[in-house]
Amino acid sequence: MSDLHKAFAKSKLAKLPPEAPLLSESSSMNHPAESSHDEDSSSVSSTGTVIPSPSRQLFARASQGSSDSSSLSWSDFFAKELFLTRETDTLRIIHHVYLTPPTDSGPLFVMHHGAGSSGLSFATCAEEIRKILPKAGILSLDARDHGRTSVQRTDGGAAELDLSLETLNQDLVYVARKTQAEMGWEELPDLVLVGHSLGGAVITDVAKKGELGNKVLAYAVLDVVEGSAMDALQSMEKYLSTRPSRFPSLTSGVEWHTRSRTIRNRASARVSVPSLLYKEETPSDPAKPWVWRTNLSATKPFWEDWFIGLSRKFLEARGGKLLLLAGTDRLDKELMIGQMQGKYQLQVLPEAGHFIQEDMPAKTAQILVDFYKRNDRSALVLPPKVADMRASAAMQKGAGAGASFSALHGGSSAGHLHKP
């Protein structure tokens, strides 16, 4: 699993002396006038006329203090949250979704996070997308057994953990269709599927199976490929044993993520990390009552299922394809060949860590918006078909011949027969 493999490497950095400075994108994003880096100027200029939201003021305080790890609210980044109830013969599932609806026929970016994360992993990126493309909508879900999505048996017992790729596929399709019904949309907007790590495997599977029909314009996979993900399975359990299992507070959880360089953008960590933890009612260690919502060790039976065949499906599915990586070393052979054949768009942000959308939200947003625009069918002006051009030319030629014939015969279009 790519995210855990990356995090394992980062866990070694956590043991080093004081942390290096966090990525500067958040400060340049929040204080454009103070930025002197040309590499950020394009994203800053694209948002220069947007009125700052309340979250921008909160970010400003964090930048000035440089160590503020207090939590930020989801409502600073999304318009609403939905709780979508789904019942089967044995289960009652309440899917939790963060949503900002599209306007003026704008696209809907459907985001799926990685294992152990939540829908708020895309919070800062979602806000940046809206700055660049105000008509765009964002739907970012909590996968089952993640965030605030819950699964219970109808008889009140504990539900068996099911994070198979097929189940996650069906969950995403259900959330998209149910959101359409809840919002009263006659049809789904044009969709751009975006998945990080495990989420990349899920959205690729949905695109390959055509579950959402031709509404899927394109799909983007963030920092996961089959080869490196499968290789990382060997070190996954070791990584899980090295990270803290408990925290004294939410603030300390945010601090651990930034100091370990798991998330390199403090502003994003402040909104995403609190959703990863919950406070035990009767903690085994009262000094550290905050624990992980998702037991990643328990997901081991599904690890290989998530990523086997990912590269093939990514290349074969219909729609525009984007692979956004933190390093080209992640490409496997199948994807390298596909890239040389021009089958998909490849973007690399080497300055980011595994959580690209959190580390570099403005740059990730710009890449995603540009990707959408390249695949926007409504913006295409197709040339006329050759057959239509020939038919039009023939009609014009025929009209010209008719006019000449009429002139030669006294202007009478009906014609008259004269006896000799």
Swiss-Prot record:
It comes from Aspergillus fumigatus (strain ATCC MYA-4609 / CBS 101355 / FGSC A1100 / Af293) (Neosartorya fumigata). This is Protein phosphatase methylesterase 1. GO terms for molecular function: protein C-terminal methylesterase activity. Residues 18-28, 42-51 have a biased composition (Low complexity). Keywords: Hydrolase, Serine esterase. Belongs to the AB hydrolase superfamily. Gene3D superfamilies: alpha/beta hydrolase (3.40.50.1820). InterPro entries: AB_hydrolase_1, AB_hydrolase_fold, PPase_methylesterase_euk. The keyword Hydrolase applies. SUPFAM superfamilies: alpha/beta-Hydrolases (SSF53474). Residues 18-51 are annotated as: Disordered. It holds the Pfam family Abhydrolase_6.
